Regions:
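N-terminal amphipathic/basic leader segments beginning at the initiator methionine
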Residues: 1-14
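A generic structural signal for well-ordered coil/turn residues at beta-strand boundaries
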Residues: 8-11, 139, 150-152, 187-188, ...
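Generic N-terminal amphipathic, Lys/Arg-enriched alpha-helix
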Residues: 12-21, 40-46, 269
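Glycine-rich beta-strand-to-loop/alpha-helix junction loops that act as flexible
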Residues: 17-19, 74-82, 195-196, 273-275
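Glycine- and acidic-residue-enriched helix-capping/strand-helix junction motifs
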Residues: 21-31
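N-terminal small/polar loop signature for handling phosphorylated ligands or for N-terminal nucleophile
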Residues: 29-99, 110-117
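Proline/glycine-rich low-complexity loops and linkers
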Residues: 84-216
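An accessory alpha-helical subdomain
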Residues: 189-280
Length: 280
């Protein structure tokens, strides 16, 4: 039998959640890192969105992401403090209930046992703070875990329900450590939720890419070529740019003006991007 062809990987998006980013209290590091992680695999980021800790805005952003059919990473807000709303908003966006994920609960208990052991204290599962930590494993029904190599507290993946977009099984999807069911990767994408802490989020995002989307990797599939143009205005270059795109539909033309470049001064970087053959 001929194995089914891998499902296509759609566009990639990023949602960064947290008031601390929008207020400037914390500088976002996720956008450049996600661009780097995707680029190393021949992929690119199509869009990014920043959202504060407003449940209504988070829910709306997640609904748009689910409906887009894109593969989306969402960072932040999956903890168990009052200002963490992402888990609840994800359930609301999907129209499903929240429930304690069995494997997530197991991993969280393992983490609590590790902490007790490190502190030389007995593990007390019924202690109020330990019981509260299990809330970090309360995910939308149907969610699947993303392993966290830093402290075992998992993230989770959700896929569109019928009505938001079909999510069928991916060929060759691997199960996360611990024996969970294989992830479902639909050709309409899904959202992968990770913590806001880079030390946790970035290896988790890499795991998602390498485990769920390796069939989409295409190193060298997107290249750029550009030249520095002096003494020209974008308006005068526009007819040339339009002609290039008209005659070469497989490439995209870009212009990046600069007024105070330390080396070139005032100039325009004019270039094309696309597949290696088309760009050459």
């Amino acid at each position: 039998l001929v194995p089914p062809a891998p499902e296509p990987v759609g566009a990639f998006g990023l949602i960064v959640i947290g008031d601390e980013i929008l207020s400037g209290k914390r500088a976002d590091k996720h956008l450049p890192k996600v661009i780097e992680l995707l680029g190393a695999r021949g992929l690119s980021l199509a869009w990014a969105e920043y959202v504060g800790d407003s449940p209504a805005r988070i829910t709306a952003a997640l609904q748009r992401a689910f409906e887009s059919g894109d593969v989306v990473f969402s960072t932040g807000g999956i903890g168990a403090t009052p200002d963490d709303h992402t888990r609840q908003c994800a359930a609301r966006a999907l129209g499903v209930e929240l429930a304690l994920h069995p494997q997530a609960a197991e991993l969280i208990r393992e983490r609590m046992q590790d902490i007790a052991r490190e502190q030389g204290k007995p593990y007390e599962p019924d202690r109020p703070d330990n019981a509260h930590r299990l809330n970090m494993g309360v995910f939308p029904v149907g969610a699947q875990i993303i392993p966290n190599p830093y402290n075992k507290i998992p993230g989770f993946s959700c896929y569109p329900q019928s009505g938001l977009g079909a999510a069928g099984p991916s060929q060759g999807a691997k199960a996360p450590p611990g024996g969970s069911e294989p992830h479902t990767v639909g050709e309409r994408g899904g959202i992968h939720f990770v913590p806001g802490f880079p030390v946790m989020a970035w290896p988790m995002i890499e795991w998602v890419l390498d485990t769920l989307y390796p069939h989409g990797f295409a190193a060298g599939a997107w290249v750029e070529q550009s030249v520095i143009v002096f003494g020209a205005m974008e308006a005068t270059l526009t007819p040339l740019m339009e002609a290039i795109e008209r005659e070469h539909p497989l490439v995209k033309v870009f212009s990046l003006p600069s007024v105070d470049h330390p080396q070139y001064g005032r100039h325009i970087e004019l270039g094309v991007k696309g597949g290696p053959v088309a760009v050459a």
